[in-house]
Amino acid sequence: DIESYLNIPSDSPYEPGSVMKGITYAAALDSGNYPYNEEFRAGTFSYTYDESTGKISRTSGSTAYPSISDALGNDFGTISYDEGFIRSSNVGICCLLADHLPAKTFEEYLNRFGFFTKVDIPFVANAAGVKNFSHPSDILSTGFGQSSSVTALQMVQAYSAIFNDGVMMRPYVVEKIVDSYSNETIKS
C-alpha cells in the first residue's frame, strides 16, 4: 500500500569509500597490471598530470594538484601492495593507478562491473550513480571510493563477480522460496 517510497540501496547513489578498493585491486589483478612483489611509499601522494598523455606521475614536493594522504594521517612507510590493501591505503591505490593500472583500463573495468548504469532488475527502481573522471584527483579518488558515486545494489553486483570466480550475478527479486523436495512454499 505504499504509493511513494525510496529504496535506499538501489535509489541513493553515494561515495562508497574504502569498499571500492577491492574493485580497484580486482581490476589490476584481472587486467594483468597488479605489481606482485613491488612496494610503494605510503603516507602522502603528490603528483603531476600530463594533459597530453593523461599520465599521472608521483612526485616529491608540492604541486598544483592536491596531495592525497592515507586516512587519519597514517604513514605506513614502504610497504607491499598486498599490505597496502590490508591497511586500506589510499596512497597504495594512487600508486596503483599512477604506475600500473591505466585510467582507461580502470574506467573500462568500472563499466564492466556495472557501475554508472542502472542494474537490470525487475520491479526495483534504481539509480545509475555518477562517474566523475573530470580531473586527475577524481580518477585517483574514485579508486578509493570518493569523487564518483554508486549504489549499494551496484556494489553488491560487482562484488558478486569477485566472489564467484569472475562471473557477475545479476540481483533479482525473490517472490517465494520453495522446498525442492516437497515442492512446499517455505516463505512467500
Ranges and model annotations:
Residues 1-17, 23-188:
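Beta-lactam-recognizing serine transpeptidase/beta-lactamase-like catalytic domain environment
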